[in-house]
């Protein structure tokens, strides 16, 4: 994690979460649990050295790893599990299923599991270089002057892929015989404490320590010719530089920088994959002690993984042959720089060459999201090496609406350190998809069945959880590099919502969530000494109605290496181990013993030549020894250990040499000086029994108690072991050393410890709950403990409603049910919780003697009554918290009383006559006003009405906030609200809020004043001159119906005009109304709004608004139509652009019976679908119904009735000019047969062909069938040829201009037979008006006049038709 305060890199790299979906686990191999320390160096290991390098499993030729005091987090293997929870979250269940077969590799040692397999993500083997130097047959001066080549060119190019190299050794005998010795590289098994102290000092202080016991781990030196040093020219020691000089220009390097896809899934992810830096460095001989060179890396690179302590793995460069430091490392992580400062090694040796092989990491802080072609570069000296990679972060785990991601972001592990086992951090992204989740819960658990050596743990003692809320739309770093300053810390909001489980788990209840959260879990490792620990932690997000999303993270361990080479030397060493089976031979599973002193003496001179202390894994190494015989002595053995038998078996590398032995160094290291020791073990224990007679002594009939926990501790109180008694009450601690121990017995549930040491027989009496046991060369089976069953008692009584508030239970007062009562012990710890029953009773059972605290929760709406009011503790109230004592009997005296305090709310409703919003002395209350009381949720609680004085009151109310609503009384209007400063005198309006807080609230008033009423009306008159205005001579019309509607269209009044035409509506409020006049029979509506004067007619329907005044301006006029001289011009202009095809088929049957009186009734009904009714009745009774339906919907109905009793020139000019581009073809074929019987024998053949062609470009097809029946009876001898040519040329942009100017002058009418019915365009029969009567004295002139008029009309249409054609 990057420390953003001081810009110092602390740690950052965590594992990126799943590559599979729903449930995945990432397995890393990290840190120093398998420390493969060393360098890609010059000289190789001999065969014996390879064997000596093994720790506990030499026969397997496999390097094993001891527990590290300081595990580092390096690079990890990726191992995944996939799980999909198919259960809905309502059940809150999880199922974990493992997939895949992987093996965890820790250094060279594997962890094999049935369902998990992993490969070492960053396992570095020590590489040794080859030397082609061959010895000359004899030494020459030239040879002596030759510069020492620590490594030839070939040595600078080891097989980096194989991590192995072969050494061509020099001759090893004095006769200069050539011997080619080849050896493969191996790894040295060490514990991390071996590299801790010195490495940290070097990193921090750039110092060089020569303390062997504290030295960094170096490799055994390579096999070399005996006299090789005689051929080396050691440079004269030069004085150190007076000041440090940058010698980057004197450094040459051959470097590779490789992106490593650790899990080989073709996806590169920071902290999951890594960079491999390998370089062979040549140092110019001009370089002096104190000079330095640098390694600079780009900001996309960082030099340690999850563990900030791992930085020491990129530390000093040492010569593995003699352990000398060539250059010390100093890190400047803020500037991405490593500075290497040379020691005097470069002053004493020429042609120094060094090799480094580091795993370095990608910095997710600078790579927040997936990105292609990200550059990584490292500059060693002045040479820069670059590489690029496409970074592809995995997606979050998403299952329906649930989404989650997680990674370990910091781990510091100290294996074998009980006081400080280390810690780790996991960062979890909760709901990164920002979905709306219901009942969202996050479960974090440090457990997986496939990882039994999991050293993670989660519990409230060691775990700290931080929770941050992510702003909407914020982009989270996909490498889990979180800047918490940009987030909101909401940890305190969720502290009470974190529940820790017994199985190393914690559950965080987020409730309903619609944003993302970052959860950081910081917890400690479990103490472990395992050589192959793993860390696994699972996370699961669940919510209602969605499947859970789960994943996990896992870690394993390995390390880095670097080094250089110089003069080869010899070493003595090997191993001190605990020989558990005491057979004197090292076997698999037997561990090393640390802190044993090893001293080496020259066996010839008895001079001490070296000393070492075994490391924690039991290994030791004493360097810089020439060939010869040496005595090796072991001392300072751990207390209580004894030496195993020596020289057992025939393998000197596996047997024990004893406390003192002589070994020989002859041209190679001798790593066979071992010592086996063992510790004698003893047992401690005995018996736990039920002491039924409570005498503290085991009797024959008393039986053991099974399942009792017994704990063994050392003298310092540290827990060593825990066991439980068996079915017979027996227990035993085994494999114990001599010493003093503490034994603690846990009191079994329901029991009480018996008397301690009652008798003189220590094997039969009880030692109590805690005792001391001593082991001194023998078992101790005397530690017993007795218990008897604890008697149980009850505590409780009663919770009642103290209606009279006197603090005592009265016979009429009843219990309160559902009251929560809590029982606590003297320490305040909750023991039980219960609720009172329906009668107010409660009881706690199964209690032992003791003092208890009882707490009563005040029920909602109640107040505790007074405490201890009487002398009878059985009926008085003990209050909400009291103490109860149980002493060998039940205690049923703990009571608590409560009462309900109630209050009133109300005041006054008055008539505010002056409308000032304030109650005045002379203003009186309004009775009968409805007042409603509601709670805060608008639920109606009560309704009252004001009394005769305007007062109202709501009683028996609890504390709280209420709403009061006043209903406006009929005929009143609410006055102004809160006009004054006196809340008790002003008006609170129709709706107000009242608060009751331990007192009545009588301040809620409402004032009203009487609403003024208004009138509406005026006049309906006979408009004799039809000018639309009332003239002084025109009179009113009586009994005209007038209807009044409100704004909603509801009828609220109906009246009729009086004898003077007047009407009126009274008692109206201000508002909008509609007045409707019903037209009197036989009258016609006069023109409306002809002037702005209020004397004009307003029409049949009038909208009017009354605003604080009467309105007497609503008039209407009617006139009677003149029946003698009807001059009617009806212009119907309708523009409708309507294309209509109108076929007008008109069958006209003209039957004419001509007596001497000829009634020629030519009734032609021509229907052309345009609702244009031109009905013209002349003497010839010609009904021309031109019904042309064009989409113009224009109804022009021109009815002109001309009676034969009047002289009327019926000049019917029907001009239906409807411009609609409407080509309406109307073929009106009218066959008119006129049969006329007359005294003068005249046949009147009225043949009327009506051809109506109307072309109308109209999209609507209108078929107009018109049947025209022309029956004419005439008494005259006339040949009536009725040739009716009707051309209906409807050219209508819906411009229908129908001028029906009927001027009909009829003198006398010949009596005619009236026609009974005709058909309109709705096919409904209707009677036609008669055109004359028998007493009119009419002659045939009318008939002929009508015929001529009709003929003229036909000719006009015919002419138009021809023109159209």
Swiss-Prot record:
Subunit: Interacts with host DSG1; this interaction increases S.aureus adherence to keratinocytes.
Location in the cell: Secreted, Cell wall
Protein name (database record): Serine-aspartate repeat-containing protein D
Stored SUPFAM superfamilies: Bacterial adhesins, Hypothetical protein PA1324
Compositionally biased residues, Acidic residues: 1091-1101, 1118-1304
Propeptide: 1332-1365
Short motif LPXTG sorting signal, span: 1328-1332
Segments forming domain CNA-B: 569-680, 681-791, 792-901, 902-1012, 1013-1123
Entry function: Cell surface-associated calcium-binding protein which plays an important role in adhesion and pathogenesis. Mediates interactions with components of the extracellular matrix such as host DSG1 to promote bacterial adhesion to host cells. Contributes to the resistance to killing by innate immune components such as neutrophils present in blood and thus attenuates bacterial clearance.
PTM sites of type Pentaglycyl murein peptidoglycan amidated threonine: 1331
Feature: compositional bias, Basic and acidic residues: 130-145, 174-183
Keyword terms of this UniProt record: Calcium, Cell wall, Peptidoglycan-anchor, Repeat, Secreted, Signal
NCBIfam families: LPXTG_anchor (TIGR01167), MSCRAMM_SdrD (NF012181), YSIRK_signal (TIGR01168)
Annotated stretches, region: Disordered: 54-185, 857-884, 972-991, 1078-1341
Species, as recorded: Staphylococcus aureus (strain MSSA476)
Motif (YSIRK-G/S signaling motif): 23-34
